[in-house]
Amino acid sequence: KDGTEVPEDFRGYTMALATCLERIRGEFNAPIQVISAYRTPEYNKRCGGSKNSQHLLGKAADIRIAGITVADLASTVERLIEEGAIIQGGIGTYPQQNFVHYDIRGNRARWKG
């Protein structure tokens, strides 16, 4: 949201994440709203992000799809991971803010915000 370009070192991650997001989008045949993706350390601190946030590496996106519940979006992401269609990573559900965090960290992490 601060308009900073993703550093060259992280662009491979953001491309892999974008590929996964496109696969998720295809499941619903609807646009994904990306609320937050790559963050600079300064922006991450301002928005209250974790100091070890995957957003800092360009590996994470907070997403929503109009008309789809957080629970349905998260369960679809989980299924796609289990099927090997997208990269294993973190899924955080934030029903009060109406978004799902998905990241491609490479290992399983689940939480509720």
Locations of regions flagged by a protein language model:
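N-terminal start-of-chain detector that recognizes signal peptides
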Residues: 5-7, 32-38, 71-76
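Short, conserved helix/loop micro-motifs enriched in His/Cys and acidic residues
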Residues: 1-8, 45-60
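Extended, low-complexity, intrinsically disordered C-terminal regulatory tails
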Residues: 21-48
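Active-site acidic/histidine clusters and adjacent loop/turn architecture
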Residues: 1-31
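A short linear-motif detector with a strong N-terminal bias
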Residues: 12-15, 39-44, 78-83
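Catalytic cores and adjacent binding grooves of peptidoglycan-active enzymes
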Residues: 52-113
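Amphipathic alpha-helical interface surfaces
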Residues: 13-20, 30, 43, 59, ...
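Short His-Asn-centered micro-motif
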Residues: 13, 35-37, 66
